[in-house]
A protein has these predicted regions:
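Conserved C-terminal structural/oligomerization subdomain of aldehyde/semialdehyde dehydrogenase
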Residues: 11, 59-202
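ALDH superfamily catalytic-core signature
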Residues: 1-71, 92-94, 133, 199-202
Length: 202
C-alpha cells in the first residue's frame, strides 16, 4: 500500500508526464547519470515503478525499488543523490532501529509516524546529526539551530554562531615567570611534598 501511495504521489506532484514538468530537475552531469543508470540496471528485478531514462536530457523518472529484505542491493551501498527510492520492509520498529544502528550514523533521520510512542522509541535509540518528524530537510530552516553530523556523517556544526565555533580553535596558554619554580614539582619527592600535593588535590 505504501508503494502504491508513493507512485500516486509522484503523479499528483509532477503530473502524468513527469519528464515534461519544468519543476522536475535533471542529473547534474553525465558521470552521475551513468552511475544511477548502472544502479537501476543492477536492481532491475526490484523495480516497482518509474526508472525511465533519457541520457541526452540527463533525466531519470522517479524510481521506487521494492527491496523486501535485501540489504545488499546496489541501491543500498552508497548515497544515491538521484530520484531513486529503495524501500526495505520490516515487521517491527525494533528491526528498523537495529538496521540503522548497524551502520554509520546518519546525517539526518526522517521519521514518519502519528504515534508519539514510536517517536520516543526511535529518538531515544538512534543517534543522528539532525531529526525531522513527518517531514524532510526542514530542520535546516532555522539558522539558530545547529546543523551537522555525528561520526562518519560529519564533524562540527554549522549555522550562525555554531559555524563560528566550529572553525574556531580555543587554545589554552599558560604563562609562568622564567625565574619562578615550585619545589614541590621536582624531586626529591619527600613525604612532606606528597602530603602537600594530596592536600591541594582534595
Amino acid at each position: 500500500q505504501f508503494l502504491t501511495e508513493m507512485k500516486t504521489a509522484f503523479s499528483h506532484l509532477y503530473g502524468k508526464e513527469i519528464k515534461k514538468n519544468p519543476d522536475f530537475g535533471r542529473i547534474v552531469n553525465e558521470r552521475h547519470m551513468e552511475r544511477l543508470q548502472k544502479i537501476l540496471e543492477q536492481d532491475a528485478k526490484y523495480l516497482f515503478c518509474g526508472g525511465e531514462a533519457d541520457t541526452l536530457q540527463r533525466y531519470i523518472e522517479p524510481a521506487i525499488l521494492d527491496l523486501g529484505k535485501d540489504q545488499n542491493a546496489a541501491s543500498m551501498q552508497e548515497e544515491l543523490f538521484g530520484p531513486i527510492l529503495p524501500v526495505l520492509s520490516y515487521h517491527k520498529l525494533e528491526d528498523a532501529v537495529r538496521f540503522v544502528n548497524k551502520r554509520a550514523k546518519p546525517l539526518a533521520l526522517y521519521l514518519f509516524t502519528k504515534k508519539r510512542s514510536a517517536e520516543k522509541f526511535v529518538l531515544e535509540r538512534v543517534s543522528s546529526g539532525g531529526v525531522c518528524v513527518n517531514d524532510t530537510i526542514s530542520h535546516l530552516i532555522n539558522p539558530d539551530l545547529p546543523f551537522g553530523g555525528v561520526g562518519a556523517s560529519g564533524m562540527g556544526q554549522y549555522h550562525g554562531k555554531y559555524s563560528f565555533d566550529t572553525f574556531t580553535h580555543e587554545k589554552s596558554v599558560f604563562y609562568k615567570p622564567a625565574d619562578w619554580n615550585l619545589p614541590v614539582c621536582y624531586p626529591p619527592f619527600t613525604k612532606g611534598k606528597m602530603n602537600l600535593v594530596k592536600f591541594f588535590l582534595k
